[in-house]
Amino acid sequence: MEHNPKTILLVEDDVALNRAVVFKLEQKGHRVVSVFRAEEALEKLQSEHGNIDVVWLDLLLPGMNGIEFLAEIHKREDYKNLKVVICSVSGREESKGIARGLGAVDYLVKSDYEIDALVEKVLSYA
């Protein structure tokens, strides 16, 4: 259990990965707000009133995708300091550039990391 628990908004539609990440983060003493769609993430950002330390964001989501989510929060003043880390299966340079241009602090390709390393990397931004 960590001494400084963080709140992570997990936006991941892969059910198995979502559950595994929630388990790993909660095991470390962190609070996880888990959603499967970007639209739900926008609702959680409002209801959490600035309590989110970092967002784990998948790009390929049903409905609103990760880039559209980033574009939406990028234009809102109250989210200008929100740290968003992209965790995607896509390693396309174009996607990386767009995501960083919209304020993502990092872009991680899921296949490049074991789950524990992904979790630690995202937590490093919290």
Describe the residue ranges of each PLM region.
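Non-catalytic signal-transmission and effector/linker regions of two-component phosphorelay proteins
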Residues: 1-9, 116-126
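Conserved acidic carboxylate
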Residues: 12
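The feature encodes the CheY-like receiver
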Residues: 18, 62, 92
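Charged docking surfaces used in two-component/phosphorelay signaling
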Residues: 19-27
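Acidic, metal-coordinating helix/loop segments flanking the phosphotransfer/catalytic sites
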Residues: 34-54
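Acidic catalytic/metal-coordinating carboxylates
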Residues: 37, 65-71
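Active-site residues of response regulator receiver
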Residues: 58, 88
